[in-house]
């Protein structure tokens, strides 16, 4: 950047950034003190506009395709220079932050933003270290220029906006995008590429720890309950979305939370509710005339969000780290109403369901998605963020589970008694009771019933849960129709899994079509 031509605010405080955002017309204050900002037409991630620079140091390690689209190194150089020139006379906000709450596995990153509220988001979601880059690692750079308009013909992009990762130069370019989630997910993708080479499993999961130091992980796509279920008043939060699992422990990749706000209530989600206050960024949340947020209003998007630092949560693990997990929960949102609320998995079944990543897009975080809920298979419960081939992550998961002896569970936070539109969704208290049973160890060696088509072991009793709910066939009025839907789901699993080169033990661990 050309210093002297523009005003640069370096490592600004929360109060300064809120003040700048209000003065510059970037947002408004709510009655609870949070800052509301609107992102315009792009109210979610833009996967079609995300690229990775194809260069010799990383190209052999990346699974190229529609998720990881290749970008020309020369075109990147030109576009980066044009964005720098565009920002040269603009007021800018810059912070030196870190990604990864681990002394060995952190990445230092300098974040430069055109908007004050984007900088506040970055400082909420990334880690503000006591001492920046104590191991003197090469520093990553993020530039976020939301008002820069890309020209596909000139810039080599797919539209007027883009996200580009460059592993060789340690650069992330965001241009033409106001949705702040792109910043956090771009650095998550960076860590998802770097960590496996160090023997660390990067995970799209939340994590918490009990009073006795027992760690639980919750894997799942957006909207399946990662943030809600890990924000447990009886446990201490490590983080809500991105973690690394190294030999000896897990660590948060972030320093904050990015919670979905749609239908947020104080009763069901008190931890998140209380975290929304001064310093929090609310994205696309609608307010009433008294500036009170209306979390039921989805007129701008289903994907309304709250971004706040972990310090806003009273019951948190202050070092953002935990021991290796005794329990690992795969959260799936089953729109067919076929899966049980909880199943106990073998390690082969864990690998099968981790690779499958069966769930639904709920209030999708991607632009272009309607509010319609549809089933999907998202490898590793986060396909859009993993640059390496899926097998790399599955092998690391198997290794970690085996070496520590973690027990894996499949928990359905979706529908029962019929598909979406006919059946009803499991309520949060029911799922919380199941999670309580998991973390207490109650389900470790219990009596189970085997569901043949789904090839799943289901406990016959769970404290605090109606036993009729545990075997899904009991909740369907038409048992023959249930069998038909179960068969359809088993076929969908088998068809999706055909692409994976795995052992017979893993392949045979799935549903039986």
Curated annotation (Swiss-Prot):
Its EC number is 4.1.1.49. GO terms for cellular component: cytosol. It catalyses: oxaloacetate + ATP = phosphoenolpyruvate + ADP + CO2. Disulfide bonds: none annotated. It comes from the Bacteria. Belongs to the phosphoenolpyruvate carboxykinase (ATP) family. This is Phosphoenolpyruvate carboxykinase (ATP). It comes from Shewanella baltica (strain OS195).
């Amino acid at each position: 950047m050309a210093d002297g031509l523009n005003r640069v605010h370096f490592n600004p405080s929360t109060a300064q950034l809120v003040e700048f955002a209000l003065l510059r017309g970037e947002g408004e204050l709510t009655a609870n003190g949070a800052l509301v900002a609107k992102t315009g037409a792009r109210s979610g991630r833009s996967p079609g506009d995300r690229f990775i620079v194809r260069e010799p140091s990383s190209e052999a390690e990346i699974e190229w395709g529609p998720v990881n689209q290749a970008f020309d190194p020369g075109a990147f150089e030109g576009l980066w220079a044009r964005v720098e020139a565009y920002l040269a006379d603009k007021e800018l906000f810059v912070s030196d932050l870190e990604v990864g709450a681990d002394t060995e596995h952190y990445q230092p990153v300098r974040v430069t933003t055109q908007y004050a509220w984007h900088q506040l988001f970055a400082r909420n979601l990334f880690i503000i270290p006591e001492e920046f880059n104590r191991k003197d690692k090469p520093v990553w750079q993020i530039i976020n220029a939301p008002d820069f308009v890309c020209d596909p013909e000139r810039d080599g992009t797919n539209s007027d906006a883009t996200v580009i990762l460059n592993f060789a130069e340690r650069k992330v370019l965001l241009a033409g995008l106001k949705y702040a989630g792109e910043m956090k997910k771009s650095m998550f993708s960076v860590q998802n590429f770097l960590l496996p080479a160090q023997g660390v499993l990067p995970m799209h999961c939340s994590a918490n720890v009990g009073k006795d130091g027992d760690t639980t992980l919750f894997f799942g796509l957006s909207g399946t309950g990662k943030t809600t279920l890990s924000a447990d008043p009886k446990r201490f939060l490590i983080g809500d979305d991105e973690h690394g699992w190294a030999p000896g422990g897990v660590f948060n990749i972030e320093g904050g939370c990015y919670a979905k706000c749609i239908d947020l209530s104080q009763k069901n989600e008190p931890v998140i509710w209380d975290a929304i206050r001064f310093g929090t960024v609310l994205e696309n949340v609608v307010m009433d005339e008294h500036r009170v947020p209306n979390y039921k209003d989805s007129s701008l998007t289903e994907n309304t969000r709250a971004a706040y630092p972990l310090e806003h949560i009273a019951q948190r693990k202050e070092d953002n780290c935990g021991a290796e997990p005794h329990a690992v929960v795969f959260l799936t949102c089953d729109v067919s109403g076929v899966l049980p609320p909880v199943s106990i998995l073998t390690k082969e079944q864990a690998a099968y369901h981790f690779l499958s990543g069966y769930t639904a897009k709920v209030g999708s975080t991607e632009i272009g998605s309607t509010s319609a809920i549809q089933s999907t298979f998202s490898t590793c419960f986060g396909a859009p963020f993993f640059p390496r081939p899926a097998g790399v992550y599955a092998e690391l998961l198997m290794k970690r589970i085996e070496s520590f002896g973690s027990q894996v569970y499949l928990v359905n936070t979706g529908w029962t008694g019929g598909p979406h539109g006919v059946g009803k969704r499991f309520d949060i208290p029911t799922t919380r009771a199941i999670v309580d049973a998991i973390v207490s160890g109650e389900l470790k060696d219990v009596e189970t019933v085997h569901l043949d088509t789904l090839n799943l072991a289901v406990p016959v009793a769970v404290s605090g849960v109606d036993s009729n709910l545990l075997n899904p066939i009991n909740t369907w009025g038409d048992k023959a129709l249930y069998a038909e839907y179960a068969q359809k789901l088993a076929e969908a699993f088998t068809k999706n899994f055909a692409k994976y080169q795995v052992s017979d033990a893993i392949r045979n661990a799935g549903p039986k079509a």
